[in-house]
Regions:
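Structural detector for short beta-strands of small beta-barrel domains
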Residues: 58-79, 117
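C-terminal accessory region of SF2 helicases/translocases
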Residues: 601-693
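Short boundary/loop segments of OB/S1/cold-shock single-stranded nucleic-acid-binding domains
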Residues: 42-62
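Long, highly charged, low-complexity intrinsically disordered interaction regions
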Residues: 1-14, 23-26, 232, 242
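Upstream accessory/linker segments immediately N-terminal to the RecA-like ATPase cores of bacterial MutS
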Residues: 74-264, 638, 671
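Inter-lobe coupling/hinge segments of SF2-like helicase ATPases
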Residues: 275-278, 289-611, 667, 671-675, ...
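N-terminal pre-Walker A segment at the start of P-loop NTPase domains
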Residues: 267-277
Length: 693
């Protein structure tokens, strides 16, 4: 038996990890040596052989070696250092925008340099921007890497080189310490051991096929993917078992309020809406808490379904809480529910972070006394000081913004007198069946697969940025001649609200100049909620012709007169998000258009993506296509499933394993409860506390 277990060895025991470094590593959930070993590379770089400079092709990542010919600093539009090296077959220009005197001195003429980076075609031949480089000693042969070089997910202040050095130490510890094998012997037979798999994935030998690693097919990956998917499924089984131990208030049929609401509507619910309502009502009549996910495409009428579910609870004298991810969306829900419920004598309350002082206190008192039966708001409705009076149903809108942990915390909060509230979760992001089986294995699923009559399909076109002026003319025509309104959406690669806001402000200034006859508004994530609400209100009332926005308008904004949307750089967004954005138009009876204003050249994947949007308005078709065309390295993150990203598994790539994993998870859950618990702790520690609830 080896020494102590690596899940008990803190990272601070490694050389080079002091208090400051520990805090940085904690930001990416790295606390123990086991955590570090399970923090696997995103991709690999092959630095094991040299490329002749003369044979470099644009877009190829390569290691080159050459002699420094010159190194100069220029002070044009931007301070820059350029260094040229030659290996006899050609000359490479290395460009640096961030540099210091020590770097300049190290690149003295005549020195030999080993450089790695992406080759580009420059003005004077091959170029690399900010390559990694090392000045060679007097060795006649360059010091190349012996294994493929891992590239890890990281955080600010933690360099790749640091993670590689720490991982080297962690791999050495595998010789003296143990990492526990948790798979039952009948499952792990014929598979790589955990230490073998970890060594292979952190330091793959150059003989290993990169294509196997990129597609997730290597036996070392399969070993860990199986374990992670099992842990995920076991956590869902534990959550489900936990939920079934609880009791909810059974809410039997009591349809007087529902019938009044339906009689007052100017339309009849679709067959799909009626079917989903029946599924929800069946759940709510039981004494176990309902945990149901309702998927409906953009505009399929999920809100009406939620309203009917709410009336079932209110008819029994109980309260209902609806939580939305943004104040904008919450306010819109509050308005919809007031319009429907006020004629029925039901009071709708509204709670958001921006409410202060007396108004907030008055609202809290009205909730605590039971005067308000329907409460709508953001996550502010589940803060400590909000006391409910018989909360029987919780509705969460836009599940992929909340995630499993918030869903469960909210459920705990709603517990009163031994009863847990029923839970209804609504998402407009259609989830293909395989993903729903895994990501929402703790929920029952309903699908509203029919759009209400009278919706006009949106015509989508893709146009290059070179025709920007034509599109600006089209906006002018739509707003001035046709009396319509339009959205202009700015997107960014970086998940940075600041940069996104700056991009939107620059576009807003440009469009105000180009369209002086239009009232142009601006909304982005860094504005105060009240400012955002004011802009959206004036757009909804028709005071603004054109709204420049970031992707904050992705969910729930309803302006029927808006019939034109321009999305800049659509190639930067996933299909599901583009489909969500497009759903903001086509809400009235007028023909609506969405223009995908892309920058050339487009990658092959981006071309296919944009084509899918042009061909289809069906969110389920689009979600299925998304599965088929996403590259192997694209992980499914919080945006699309409500779950934290997987470390090794990829629900899209590994979907064929899921039915078998579910069978094995049930086997482990029943036969090996201790291993099941340990697997959840290893891969999904946050879920553990809920499964023990």
């Amino acid at each position: 038996m080896k020494g102590r277990l690596l899940d008990a060895v803190p990272l601070s025991s490694l050389t080079g990890v002091g208090a400051a470094q520990s805090n940085k590593l904690a930001k990416i959930n790295l606390h123990t040596v086991q955590d570090l070993l399970l923090h696997l590379p995103l991709r690999y770089e092959d630095r094991t052989h040299l490329y002749p400079i003369g044979e470099l092709l644009p877009g190829v990542y390569a290691t080159v070696e050459g002699e420094v010919l010159n190194c100069n600093i220029s002070f044009g539009g931007r301070r820059m250092m350029t260094c040229q090296i030659s290996d006899g077959s050609g000359i490479l220009t290395m460009r640096f925008f961030n540099f210091n005197a020590a770097m300049k001195n190290s690149l003295a003429t005549g020195r030999r340099v080993l450089a790695y980076g992406e080759a580009k075609r420059g003005k004077y031949g091959a170029e690399m921007i900010h390559p990694e480089y090392r000045v060679q000693g007097d060795l006649s042969t360059p010091e190349l890497q012996e294994t493929l070089t891992p590239v890890y997910p990281t955080t600010e202040g933690v360099k790749q080189a640091t993670l590689r050095k720490l991982t080297d130490q962690a791999l050495d510890l595998l010789d003296t310490c143990a990492i526990e094998e948790l798979l039952p012997p009948e499952l792990s037979q014929g598979m790589m051991t955990l230490p073998e798999a970890l060594r292979t994935l952190h330091r793959p030998p150059p003989t290993l096929q990169l294509s196997d690693l990129e597609t997730g097919q290597h036996p070392a990956q399969r070993r860990l993917i199986l374990e992670e998917l099992l842990a995920h499924n076991l956590s869902m089984l534990a959550l489900r078992a936990g939920a079934q131990r609880f009791h909810a208030q059974p809410l039997s049929a009591n349809d007087a309020l529902k019938n009044k609401l339906l009689a007052a509507l100017p339309f009849k619910p679709t067959g799909a809406q009626a079917r989903v309502v029946a599924e929800i009502e069946r759940d709510m009549a039981l004494d176990a808490p309902m945990m149901r996910l309702v998927q409906g495409d953009v505009g399929s009428g999920k809100t009406l379904v939620a309203a009917i579910a709410a009336l079932r609870a209110i008819a029994h004298g109980k309260q209902v809480a609806l939580m939305a991810p943004t104040e904008l969306l919450a306010e819109q829900h509050a308005n919809n529910f007031r319009n429907w419920f006020a004629p029925l004598g039901i009071e709708v309350g509204w709670l958001a972070g921006k409410q202060k002082g007396k108004a907030r206190l008055a609202q809290q008192e009205a909730i605590a006394s039971g005067q308000v039966q329907m409460i709508v708001g953001t996550h502010a409705i589940f803060q400590e000081q909000v006391q409910f009076n018989g909360l029987a149903l919780v509705i969460i809108d836009e599940q992929h913004r909340f995630g499993v942990h918030q869903r469960l915390a909210l459920w705990e909060k709603g517990q009163q007198q031994g009863f847990h509230p029923h839970q209804l979760i609504m998402t407009a992001t259609p989830i293909p069946r395989t993903l729903a089986m895994t990501a929402y294995a703790d929920l029952d699923t309903s699908v509203i697969d029919e759009l209400p009559p009278g919706r006009t399909p949106v015509t989508t076109v893709a146009i290059p940025d070179t025709r920007r002026n034509d599109i600006i003319d089209r906006v002018r025509h739509a707003c001035m001649t046709e009396g319509r309104q339009a959205y202009w959406v700015c997107t960014l690669i970086e998940e940075s609200e600041l940069l996104e806001a700056q991009a939107a402000e620059a576009t807003w200034e440009e469009l105000k100049l180009a369209l002086p006859e239009l009232n142009v508004g601006l909304v982005h994530g860094r504005m105060k909620p009240a400012e955002k609400q004011a802009v959206m209100a004036s757009f909804k009332q028709g005071e603004l012709h054109l709204l420049v926005a970031t992707t904050v308008i992705e969910v729930g904004v309803d302006v029927p007169n808006a019939s034109l949307m321009i999305i800049e750089n659509p190639e930067r967004l996933g299909l599901a998000q583009l489909h969500q954005l497009r759903g903001r138009v086509g809400r009235g009876a007028v023909a609506s258009h969405c223009v995908l204003l892309y920058k050339t050249p487009l990658s092959k994947t981006a071309q296919i993506r944009l084509q899918v949007l042009r061909d289809s308005n069906d969110g389920f078709v689009i979600a299925q296509k998304d599965l088929e065309i996403r590259g192997p390295g694209e992980l499914l993150g919080t945006r699309q499933t409500g779950n934290a990203e997987f470390k090794v598994a990829d629900l899209l790539r590994d979907q064929a394993m899921i039915p078998e994993v579910q069978r094995l998870a049930r086997h482990i859950h029943e036969r090996y409860p201790q291993q099941a618990k340990a697997l959840i702790e290893r891969w999904m520690p946050e879920t553990e506390r809920y499964s023990n609830a």
